[in-house]
């Protein structure tokens, strides 16, 4: 088998919806042709062929991600200085052109090279002018921005600061005043003071050079061209759904690879304007809400809080976004509080970070009239792994159509990512399997966690995701749950997510009101406990699930009503918090619904 890499964007690709009848970008284009070992006819199943082609594509893709993020951002900002790069309706400066963003970021970078001696610098700022300038300025200064979550518990926040060796935090004075429970470092720098104390003459000088000098001359005094692509560009922390957050050092290669991978799907049109309120401490918000549009020259429209529906509505009406980035938790909020016609210019909503329920997707489409596309990602993958696409991709013949999306799926893998499915218990590879524990390899995958934590998740260049997936014959990924969200009961693997879906269907409620966890059981190894915000007793639960042919082993033996399920700022369920509630109830025998134990 042969694999061709590097043709996307050429006249032989469907970039822009046209094939062949468009002007070439240049006279020469670097392409890579890769060949696999021969495969006999019996072994050449669709699944096996796909696995081999993905592996060839991943190896070829690595050959073209050798730049660094800071250099690439400087290049794109300087080459088109008059375009609108950022719209921040809540900021002092509502609109920043690319040249203006470049000028202020370079001016601050010069200042921070001298005043910030440490390599990693903490950042606690929302999306917008301040958050963008802080991250880009630190990159230009050769520093590593560490975007931190101010809503973490004090113990988790201290663990993050200690792991990263953070001594200085960039933030706003108002943010520091509001976040009284956050363990601030001894040195806190307010971004508004840094901008105000930068001489106007310095900003004007950098603005003039951005307009007048070619990129090659702009790069010379900065030293950005010498940055190793494999060096750390940004540090994020996992949400810690099942324990303390782990540090994820994302290299320049990781981030640029993911940006290029997403761009080669045709995800964003040239005139797209991305609306984002996702926090910058979230990989989805940092890469897709900041770095991707900067590198790919798309306008960013920001709102500081994803739960501020009034400001989101104002931004959507005033600034004509075409793409909205969000999570299912926030999309539920918009469905309830954003007026029907506020998103009139949106062409698509892109959902990530957690599984998008079919009912929510249908309701969003019915209310706002735009496509709702689901993707799958991981902080360790910088973050996008797979994505459903808007339109069917047409082949050369009119009859040839490759559909870009599939209901209920997380889409196909991005180009440049290889996958294999493992047995969840033995971790043995199962070539050609339809279902298993997902392992990934690609230029966007990190080499390991900070401080060599959880080394067992990285094996021979592969990252073991912890997600159990099913892959259909067309290559679409269907997420079945975290391997940690399966319980082995009486020798049978039971999916917590599947039980939650059955409960939501049985009680005609919205998903997200229930969490099923497994706790030790002396008889069967584990038993299921249901945490719910609904008013359900155990007998009603048993009766409703049994009537839907749900196996008895799958029916939770204990029901605990809670006013609210533990969750993080991103909307993701705090599984560790849920488990603690279940274990506490089991240990203390707190009051539960009448018939908890069979």
Where would I find each of the regions flagged by the language model?
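Conserved ATP/PPi-binding loop(s) of AMP-dependent carboxylate-activating enzymes
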Residues: 393-396, 409-416, 425-459, 492-494
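AMP-binding/adenylate-forming catalytic core of the ANL superfamily
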Residues: 169, 324, 442, 447-448, ...
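Gly/Ser/Thr-rich phosphate-binding loop
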Residues: 211, 321-326, 335-405, 418
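A cross-family acyltransferase "interaction/gating" segment
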Residues: 1-43
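AMP-binding/adenylate-forming catalytic domain of the ANL superfamily
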Residues: 526, 550-573, 591-597
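Conserved AMP-binding/adenylation subdomain of ANL enzymes
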Residues: 256-273, 281-322, 337
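Conserved AMP-binding/adenylate-forming core of the ANL superfamily
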Residues: 85-132, 136, 153-158, 208-212, ...
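Conserved pre-ATP/AMP-binding loop-to-beta segment of ANL
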Residues: 81-82, 126, 189-237, 244, ...
């Amino acid at each position: 088998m042969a694999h061709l890499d590097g043709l996307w964007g050429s006249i032989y690709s469907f970039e822009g919806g046209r094939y062949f009848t468009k002007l070439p970008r240049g006279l020469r284009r670097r392409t890579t042709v890769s060949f696999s070992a021969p495969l006999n006819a019996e072994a050449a199943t669709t699944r096996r062929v796909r696995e081999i082609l993905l592996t060839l594509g991943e190896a070829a893709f690595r050959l073209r991600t050798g730049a660094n993020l800071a250099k690439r951002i400087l290049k794109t900002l300087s080459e088109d200085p008059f375009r609108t790069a950022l719209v921040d309706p809540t900021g002092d400066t509502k609109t920043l052109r690319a040249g203006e963003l470049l000028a202020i970021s370079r001016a601050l970078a010069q200042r921070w090279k001298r005043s910030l001696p440490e390599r990693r610098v903490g950042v606690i700022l929302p999306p917008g002018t301040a958050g963008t300038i802080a991250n880009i300025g630190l990159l230009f200064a050769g520093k590593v921005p560490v975007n931190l979550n101010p809503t973490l518990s004090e113990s988790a926040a201290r663990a993050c600061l200690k792991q990263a060796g953070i001594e200085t935090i960039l933030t706003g004075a108002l943010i520091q005043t509001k976040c009284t429970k956050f363990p601030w470092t001894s040195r806190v720098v307010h971004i508004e003071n840094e901008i105000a104390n930068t001489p106007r003459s310095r900003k004007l000088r950098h603005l003039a050079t951005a307009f007048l000098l070619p990129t090659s001359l702009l790069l010379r005094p900065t030293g950005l061209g010498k940055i190793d692509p494999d060096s750390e560009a940004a540090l994020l922390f996992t949400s810690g759904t099942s324990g303390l957050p782990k540090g994820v050092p994302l290299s320049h290669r990781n981030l640029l690879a993911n940006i290029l991978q997403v761009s080669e799907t045709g995800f964003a049109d040239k005139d797209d304007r991305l609306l984002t309120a996702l926090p910058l401490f979230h990989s989805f918000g940092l890469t897709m809400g900041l770095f991707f549009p900067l590198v790919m020259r798309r306008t960013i429209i920001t709102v500081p809080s994803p739960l501020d529906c009034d400001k989101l509505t104002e931004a959507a009406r005033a600034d004509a976004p075409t793409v909205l980035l969000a999570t299912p938790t926030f999309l539920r909020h918009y469905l309830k509080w954003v007026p029907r016609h506020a998103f009139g210019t949106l062409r698509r909503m892109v959902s990530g970070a957690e599984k998008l329920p079919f009912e929510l997707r249908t309701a969003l489409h019915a209310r706002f009239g735009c496509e709702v596309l689901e993707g799958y990602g991981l902080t360790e993958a910088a973050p996008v792994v797979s994505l459903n696409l808007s339109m069917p991709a047409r082949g050369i013949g009119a009859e040839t159509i490759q559909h870009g999306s599939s209901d209920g799926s997380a889409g196909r893998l991005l180009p440049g990512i290889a996958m294999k499915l493992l047995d969840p218990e033995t971790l043995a590879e199962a070539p050609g399997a339809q279902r298993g524990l997902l392992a990934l390899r690609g230029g966007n995958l990190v080499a390991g966690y900070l401080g060599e934590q959880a080394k067992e998740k990285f094996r021979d260049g592969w990252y073991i995701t912890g997600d159990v997936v099913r892959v259909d014959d067309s290559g679409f990924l269907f997420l079945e749950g975290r391997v940690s969200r399966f319980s082995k009961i009486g020798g049978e693997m039971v999916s917590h997510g599947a039980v939650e879906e059955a409960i939501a269907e049985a009680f005609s409620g919205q998903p997200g009101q229930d969490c099923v966890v497994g706790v030790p059981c002396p008889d069967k190894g584990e038993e299921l406990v249901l945490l719910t915000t609904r008013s359900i007793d155990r007998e009603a639960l048993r009766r409703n699930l049994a009537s839907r042919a749900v196996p008895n082993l799958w029916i939770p033996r204990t029901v605990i009503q809670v006013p609210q399920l533990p969750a993080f700022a991103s909307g993701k369920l705090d599984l560790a918090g849920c488990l603690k509630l279940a274990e506490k109830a089991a240990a203390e025998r707190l009051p539960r619904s009448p018939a908890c134990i069979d």
